[in-house]
Amino acid sequence: ADQCSGLQGFLVFHSFGGGTGSGFTSLLMERLSVEYSKKSKLEFSVYPDRQVSTAVVEPYNSILTTHTTLEHSDCSFMVDNEAIYDICNRNLDIERPTYTNLNRLIGQIVSSVTASLRFNGALNVDLIEFQTNLVPYPRIHFPLTTYARIISAEKAYHEQLSVPEITNACFEFSNQMVKCDPRRGKYMACCLLYRGDVVPKDVNAAIAAIKTRRSIQFVDWCPTGFKVGINYQPPTVVPGGDLAKVQRAVCMLSNTTAIAEAWARLDHKFDLMYAKRAFVHWYVGEGMEEGEFSEAREDLAALEKDYEEVGRNSADGGEFEE
């Protein structure tokens, strides 16, 4: 970092469920806060799968790392293993996705988020702007990521989509990187990052059409809601890979109260195990105290409550504390 001429911040990639992804990342984020307190810290976090578990103690690790990193992270883009598996199955016809398939898909999102730092465009967005436009309160910093269009190389020759079509696709449940239902929540902010053959006129028309849809609800205290980035560099794919080379694509980062569903699922699993104090002795044996579990769980309960509060209309008297 000291060799950088214009350090904007840090991108940290980790999983919630594993010991290294949760434990080491928590320590790393704490250190970065001390050494580089003024720099942005953005996370790309892999959320545990609802069906397939790689470790029995995933709920513990997930709650503990979220609690520890909450004050050190400026923005955390969550990616759900189950959602990515489903996209590979459905959109790319991959029956048994490998980590390579999954990572290439995540790579497209990371590429979109960082494209404006690396290439020219009509409307560029830097790391600080993500926070400014997506994070209304410090703790509410877990945007939902959606990407369109994801199609296989075989289908690409007869399926090039227009700007309105890829924009609409961003609001479809099937293109989300986390399993939750935005129709049950409210949007606080949306950041649409376009790449390739895209002009502002088409984007404005697409957004105007989106705003007329009843199913997309914004909180009443943030009525405008859309931040746009346009980058002329078309999406790049790995030669010979499963993803098609397309003329244009969009990555949507949206801060929605629906993401609280993901926390509720994790909290429930944590509660089932912690009620029996199952596996806790392994953590205590490594130097942790049992009280840290209760503290982390209480913090996550507060986070769920925070999301509930911001989703209320101003008229409901929902008063939110930072």
From Swiss-Prot:
Residues forming the catalytic site: E129
KW Plastid (keyword) present: no
UniProt GO BP: microtubule cytoskeleton organization; mitotic cell cycle
Listed cofactors: Mg(2+)
Residues the record lists as binding GTP: S15, G19, T20, T54, N81, N103
Disulfide cysteine pairs (residue numbers): none
Protein name as it appears in the record: Tubulin alpha-3 chain
